Amino acid sequence: MSIVKSKIRTIPDYPKPGILFRDITSLLIDPEGFQLTIGMFVERYQNAKLNKIAAIDARGFIPGAALAFQLGVGFVPIRKKGKLPGNTISESYALEYGVDHVEIHTDAIVPGDKVLIMDDLIATGGTLEASIKLIQNLKGQIHECSTIINLPDLGGAKRIKDTYGIDVFSICEFEGH
């Protein structure tokens, strides 16, 4: 875990002053770090009998698709509103100054599918919470949520566990925001 954490770059004051942006692109361009990261997820979920990996737009797609490929399960993109063609359902989540939406195809989850939800990072948990609601609306069973990074000071993982009873597994944590 410390190897993965050491390969994640921190960019101060991005996207605005006071924010420490945890950038996974430095991890992704490092073959050892990226393979180790996906290997850790494979080890955790290889016996979970998952049907689908649902990953959140856009950085969640990278580990999500790699893990789905390794496990031989379906990959479901959860996208920002207006990016998916065809029939979709959407769910809103709060932003610092407003509201945004994510959506999923209505046929992406079959009732009873065992689903892992993935993103690159959990902060407040807003996008994961909206994704949980989407999967539950389609009658999927959420096995767990999984991220590369947890920012525990922002409380998202705890809120997901307390509100939905769903664990959030993260490979590494960073203090602050």
Curated annotation (Swiss-Prot):
Pfam families: Pribosyltran (PF00156)
UniProt subunit comment: Homodimer.
GO molecular function terms attached to this record: adenine phosphoribosyltransferase activity
Annotated compartments: Cytoplasm
Cross-referenced SUPFAM superfamilies: PRTase-like
Gene, per the UniProt record: apt
PROSITE patterns per record: PUR_PYR_PR_TRANSFER
Class of the enzyme per the UniProt entry, highest EC level: transferase
Name assigned to this protein: Adenine phosphoribosyltransferase
